Amino acid sequence: MEFIEWYPRGYGVAFKVKEKIFEGHSKFQKIEVYETEGFGRLLALDGTVQLVTEGEESYHESLVHPVMLAHPNPRRVLVIGGGDGGTIREVLRHEEVEEAIMVEIDEEVIEVAIKFIGIDGGLLDKMMKGECKRAKLIIGDGVEFIKENSGFDVVIVDSTDPVGPAKMLFSREFYERAYEALNDPGIYVTQAGSVYLFTDELVTAYENMSRVFDKVYAYSFPVIGYASPWAFLVGIKGDLDFRKIDLERAKKLNLKYYDPENHETIFQMPRYVREMLKP
């Protein structure tokens, strides 16, 4: 048996699976969990791979740590999405963080992640019970939350792809709200889809961000389970250089995939993409 996620133009990513462990429907989406033959458990939302438990760090590390290490003192962090718990887990690796708020619209994704995925080390359960001192969970719409809340050093958007229901998270209006929610200096990051298969969406998001943020960067990273390389977009408020990270803090993290040595390589986009991203 296989699980196949089909991308545009007939491109697919497939996993051999032993069994389907869970299938359900929340108010927002279809949720599935599979046991794969070689990559642990697979979480899919509306047929789209969110993670495989053996390799998920390749996504969560590359989303979180570059921006956290580029900020001189990331004390207050907002995570929008990330119901599987991987992003908030990585945020809390940074001892500078005093408060992290995670806003997830679909509570059932969190419940499934707690029961069947377990990559968060018990963090989600503690957050659901209000027992985590440094992290707070809010069940709600991140688009609405960011309209009424501000004072964040870092904003991380861990959403589904920049097509369909998540499209609002890649709009100029949302970027304006995010910019206002950031302290100065502040830094914003979002995943932006497959470099090769969602190039047009990547360019559109980059252009929208460039109209709002003081500086915008695009980078990519090979992610297990996705149509890699996977793109990420960073928006800067104030005077920060995303290419420069705190090396001492980085060395303390001892991560599996991302480290200071490969930080420079994440900016190496294919030539045609670089040409499309030029001002």
From Swiss-Prot:
Positions annotated as active site in the UniProt record: D158 (proton acceptor)
GO terms classed as biological process: spermidine biosynthetic process
Matches recorded under Gene3D superfamilies: Spermidine synthase, tetramerisation domain, Vaccinia Virus protein VP39
Keywords: Cytoplasm, Polyamine biosynthesis, Spermidine biosynthesis, Transferase
HAMAP family, per database record: Spermidine_synth (MF_00198)
Protein name (Swiss-Prot/TrEMBL): Polyamine aminopropyltransferase
Primary subcellular site in the record, as a coarse category: cytoplasm
A GO MF term: spermidine synthase activity
Record-listed S-methyl-5'-thioadenosine binding positions: Q29, E104, D141, G142, P165
Enzyme class: transferase
Domain PABS intervals: 4-237
Binding sites annotated in the UniProt record for spermidine: H60, D84, D158, S159, T160, D161
